[in-house]
A protein has these predicted regions:
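Signature of N6-adenine DNA methyltransferases within the class I
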Residues: 25, 30, 34-55, 59, ...
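Class I S-adenosyl-L-methionine-dependent methyltransferase module
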Residues: 1-156, 160
Length: 253
């Protein structure tokens, strides 16, 4: 940014708004990450905390408690085709984010028409009289708006994807998570760390980079043979730093 003529203050603001996106399944971890990012930005721009800068660090949220009956009130002033399209797409997003706290960023969100969905959710017609059906409509709008932001971040492709994945073997997964990874990540299903490797590759744009702190089980175990084959066939490994100190006998090359 400085080479392009930006001041440090403007560069910090632009990086927050255009270059950094973060997702976490845990609300507390999100808060810590948000704080760390904002404090780093403030090091270069003391005005960064004035509320005018958007920081794209989010905690993944579930759609379980959304009152879907409220969808019929949304899209006021839009034509029927737009309303029907938006409603189908919102329903699709809500379906995807059901139990999202169980799955986190391994959920695959479709690339919807986000501008259309934002217009749909922001306009509502609950009639002149308040009814039981429309009670809590504004809360529903706020919740769906938050899910749109998170969903768009999850659907995007990035130049660089960096993560420290969870290390959890299949025996430690609950039934819901285990069934999900078997269905959606069959080659990497034996450990959440390798599931996250596959997901990171999906989130990375063509020619992009991923960097992970991972355990080396995927390099040697036969259960990852197809995963390794696909990884080497479709991608280029630039560098691997392997420490043998903490590798147990069953996974040592």
């Amino acid at each position: 940014y400085e080479d392009a003529g930006y001041s440090q203050r403007d560069a910090a603001k632009s990086i927050l708004e255009n270059n950094l996106y973060g997702l976490d399944i845990d609300d507390r971890a999100y808060q810590l990450a948000y704080f760390a990012v904002m404090m780093k930005a403030r090091q270069y721009n003391r005005r960064i905390l004035n509320g005018e800068t958007t920081c794209h660090v989010y905690a993944i949220q579930e759609s379980n408690n959304i009152n879907r009956e409220h969808l019929k009130y949304l899209g006021a002033g839009m034509d029927d085709l737009e309303v029907n399209t938006a409603r189908v797409q919102v329903e699709g997003l809500l379906d995807t984010l059901r139990d999202a706290k169980e799955y986190g960023s391994i959920l695959k969100v479709e690339c919807y028409n986000w501008e259309l969905l934002r217009r749909f959710v922001s306009t509502a017609d609950d009639g002149e009289q308040i009814s039981m059906d429309s009670t809590g409509l504004e809360t529903t709008q706020d919740c769906i708006t938050r899910l749109l932001v998170i969903g768009e971040a999850m659907a995007e492709h990035y130049s660089v994807v960096v993560t420290n994945p969870p290390y959890m073997g299949s025996s430690g997964m609950g039934a819901i998570l285990s069934n999900f990874v078997k269905e959606n990540y069959s080659d990497a299903k034996s450990d959440m760390s390798t599931v996250m490797m596959e997901r990171a590759l999906q989130m990375c744009e063509a020619g992009g980079l991923i960097a992970m702190i991972n355990i080396p089980v995927w390099m040697v175990l036969t259960s990852y043979e197809k995963f390794r084959s696909d990884l080497l066939c479709k991608n280029t490994i630039i560098n691997i730093v392997l420490s043998l100190i903490h590798i147990s006998e069953p996974t040592r090359p």
